[in-house]
Amino acid sequence: MALDPGHIGPNNDPMRWGPAAVLACAAAVAFPAADATGSASQKPLTLRLAQALAVPHVLPAQSAAFAFDLTTGAAVFERNTALSLAPASNEKLAVTYAALTNLGPDYQIETDTLGQGQLVGTTWRGSLVLQGHGDPTLSQTGLAQLARQVRATGIRRVSGSVLGDESYFDSRRTAPGWKSSFYINDSAPLSALTVDRTWFHTHHSQAPSAAAASLFKDALRKQGVTVTGPALRGIANPDAQPLGAVLSPPLSQIVRFMDRESDNFTAELLLKQLGAADGAVGTSARGAAQVRATLNEAGIPLAGVRIVDGSGLSQLDRLTARAIVGILQAAWNQPELKPSFVAALAVAGRSGTLKDRLRGAPARGVVLAKTGTTAIASALSGFVRKRYAFSVLQNGHPVSSWWARRAQDRFATVLASQ
């Protein structure tokens, strides 16, 4: 499916900046070879990693670190690996693994147009329904495509309304354990039917499905289809007739945007997508249960793990360094998931949330990781070349993000120097 890099809106609002531009240009990640000119320190690796973590304003008792050699199957550093800590956006690693496992890298999310009524001549006597299934990338470009499909059926006039159906998910606009400020600043309102990440004219709509219906009515008008009735929130009848559909990009591209840019909105919709996988209404709680079940099936230790939301914004989320490294190992060892999982991570000094970190040798380009930052947590977890999986989690009230990141970067750099 072709992606339109300009459909979301002005670039000066990060909540409006959609994934399309990132998805369209993302490329497969290669692991560069080690720097042959670098000389390894004579100090034991364990000591150098411990020294890397020794920074002020970060409490060792509220920190954890784990480094694992993927080639030997041995741990090379362990500190508080079973300590239950707030993971910040490292929570997205669990959602990424569960989504790729349960849905598959090629999975696409469908948005449908349905007709309630019948076509008489060129008039649809009844209403049209725009039915969402949680596509975080749906844009006005997609609505235009749906409108063209409606016109292609011969419809030129709709006597009823345009309904926005978001019933595939529940109607909770936030996830459990969020501060009220997160709803305003860190994620658009959650819904199974959103267009342009709920941006509607000049603001984020608090009624996403009704806003989507209104935008679809406009799209129909531009295609020469007149709708007599209003745009409203509604639910499709069981006997509604399919009139068209558009698909999201593949899941592999969606998680690439989500993890590289640490996008909270996408993570929360994917969590609800997992909750709806068994035919039930998608909720954060059902999605969280599916994530936990998936981790358990992979043999990942769940003591100290609590999955509440998809993004890591919830103050109730907890992970351990051992569980995160377990997720990394599980993804690494599954050939059908590994390329998509690894490619989703930011590349040190080059892309995503690591573009301006770890820019020097030997870490640049060889550390692939997921960052995480909230007021109480900082984290960095991922891979170093094809050799190490690692996780560093640090908590505090508040945590010093500057010093925490310094420790994380030093830890990853030591591994990259091996």
Outline where the language-model segments fall.
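A small/polar active-site loop signature that marks catalytic segments
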Residues: 199-340
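Small-residue-rich helix-loop
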Residues: 76-78, 275-418
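Soluble periplasmic/extracytoplasmic beta-strand elements of cell-envelope proteins
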Residues: 64-68, 76-78, 95, 112-114, ...
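Beta-lactamase-like hydrolase cores
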Residues: 26-31, 35-84, 146-154
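Active-site SXXK
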Residues: 73, 87-105, 162, 193, ...
